[in-house]
Design a protein with these regions (language model features):
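Extracytoplasmic gate region of multi-pass secondary transporters
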Residues: 55-56, 267-323, 417-421
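Extracellular/periplasmic helix-loop-helix junction of adjacent transmembrane segments
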Residues: 58-91
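C-terminal ends and interior cores of transmembrane alpha-helices
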Residues: 68, 116-135, 348-365
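Helix-to-loop junctions at the C-terminal end of transmembrane segments
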Residues: 95-107, 326-339
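Cytoplasmic membrane-interface "Motif A"-like loop-to-helix N-cap segments
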Residues: 104-116, 336-348
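Glycine-rich segments within core transmembrane alpha-helices of 12-TM secondary carriers
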Residues: 175-200, 410-421
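Multi-pass alpha-helical transporter architecture, strongest
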Residues: 232-239, 442-466
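C-terminal transmembrane helical hairpin of 12-TM major facilitator-type secondary transporters
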Residues: 341-388
Length: 466
């Protein structure tokens, strides 16, 4: 019997293809990190210089040259502060605009646009006509340029923070993020130092509205800013895109609409980040902008201490070194012990500080020593609360919406903290004395403390894994 060949049918399936591996994060070199530190520090120094030049002029110049004469110096000052606050309204819009491009086309290119926006606006302020020359157009144009300043700064900080933290060495992210934070005291020193030189050389005194400083000298800091902008642009063009954003691009993880994605998936860190930062802003604008107006305000009218403007500027310039000292110390502590412990303990110290206003700023008993103590302690605390912010705020958001999310949190808090702080503090001190300003600081800082304690600790997380 002939045997039949037995055949076995084999079912063939297509061989599964492995998924394309996700792009690996690129390691940065020490030389690259040095270039990033330089670019982020110079850029934020220029931005804060521009901002502080306006803040100083908002107290010492603009109330008298850009607004109609008023019987009350407080009314003129509040009018000037109103334009000062316009930038803070513009800043969240700037964070949305520049954040969109920062999350879509990259951190580096977007930072160049932010620097140009603010730098050009600051230069134009130095060319504006006064109220006596142009009438109502003077404050209108001043307000427009201030708005443009806010747009630029709204995109600057978060981009500089991301440039630094997304290229940081392992375990040194707060330290890397500290460098753009140093732009704040550096810019303050440059702006106020230049104003001090001008008022000294040109012989300006409080109440002098006809001298060389008020005629043209105040314009010099604004016009000189264009030189720094050119330097800043050259430096920023030398850096590379961050490895974290390059990974987002290679893995095709970019959000179609970063703004919509933030509100859809990251609304909780958005709220937390906003309230974490609000106390920091309030403290800074109380101890700088409001304290300047209160210090040089008329003692006879009951709106200040009557200190000469050059004397007060010298005091501020000395005490700003406390700010510079606090930033790196706090960054080191945040990398060593964590963001929450560092920021939480600093917030408690700020609350205690706010309760001391009634003793240190008493118009009946104050001395230059007590004012120096008040300002120096405030600046140190400002450094401690501000230093780790460039680490904790970006760490709250995923890489594909980090520019937008951290920028909105940082800049919305500027409205709640900085924009209204000088205005509220001026009104409170005029009606209830400086102790009321201290209580205001206590309340806002307590709100920030709650946000800090409820936020996740991000010290040990990798940026590309968040």
């Amino acid at each position: 019997m002939k045997g039949r060949a037995m055949t076995t049918s084999v079912e063939h399936h297509p061989t599964p293809q492995p998924a394309a591996p996700a792009a690996q994060i690129r390691e940065t070199t020490p030389e690259e990190r040095r270039r990033v530190r330089l670019a982020s520090t110079i850029g934020t120094t220029i931005e804060f210089y521009d901002f502080y030049a306006y803040a100083t002029a908002a107290v010492a110049v603009f109330p008298f040259l850009f607004f109609p004469k008023s019987e009350s110096s407080t009314v003129a000052l509040l009018s000037s502060f109103a334009t000062f606050g316009l930038a803070f309204i513009a800043r969240p819009l700037g964070s949305v605009l520049f954040g969109h491009f920062g999350d879509k086309i990259g951190r580096k290119a977007t930072l160049v646009g932010a620097l140009l926006t603010m730098g050009i606006a600051t230069f134009v302020i130095g060319l504006l006509p006064t109220y006596a020359q142009a009438g109502i157009w003077a404050p209108a144009l001043l307000a427009l340029m201030r708005f443009c300043q806010g747009l630029g700064l709204g995109g600057e900080w978060s981009g500089a923070a991301l440039l630094s933290t997304e290229t940081a060495a392992k375990g040194r992210r707060a330290w890397a993020g500290m460098w753009p934070q140093l732009g704040a005291p550096f810019g303050f020193l440059l702006a106020n130092g230049l104003f001090l030189i001008l008022v000294t050389v040109l012989g300006h005194t409080s109440g002098d509205f006809e001298g060389a400083f008020m005629a043209w000298g105040w314009r010099v800091p604004f016009l000189l800013s264009i030189v720094m902008v050119i330097i800043g642009l050259w430096v920023r063009l030398q850096v590379e895109e961050t490895p974290v954003f390059q990974q987002v691009e290679q893995n095709d993880q970019k959000a179609a609409s970063p703004l919509a994605e933030v509100f859809k998936t990251a609304w909780k860190p958005l709220i937390q980040g906003t309230f974490i930062m609000v106390g920091c802003y309030t403290l800074f604008y109380i101890v700088t902008t409001w304290f300047l107006s209160y210090g040089i305000g008329s003692a006879e009218e009951g709106v200040g201490l009557g200190i000469a403007y050059p004397t007060f500027l010298k005091l501020q310039l000395v005490c700003i070194f406390g700010f510079m000292l606090g930033i790196p110390v706090a960054a080191h502590l945040a990398d060593t012990y964590g963001r929450r412990p560092t920021l939480g303990l600093t917030s408690v110290a700020i609350i205690v500080y706010g309760l001391c206003f009634k003793w240190l700023l008493n118009p009946e008993t104050f001395t230059m020593v007590s004012l120096g103590i008040f300002l120096f302690i405030g600046m140190i605390l400002m450094g401690f609360i501000f230093g780790p912010m460039s680490a904790i705020l970006p760490e709250l958001f995923p890489s594909n919406v980090r520019y937008t999310g951290s920028g909105i949190a940082y800049n919305v808090s500027s409205i709640l903290g900085a924009a209204i702080a000088p205005f509220i503090a001026t009104a409170l001190s005029s009606n209830y004395g400086p102790k009321a300003v201290g209580y205001y600081l206590v309340v806002v800082t307590a709100i920030s403390l709650v946000a800090i304690l409820t936020a996740p600790e991000t010290k040990d997380q990798e940026m590309h894994e968040i």
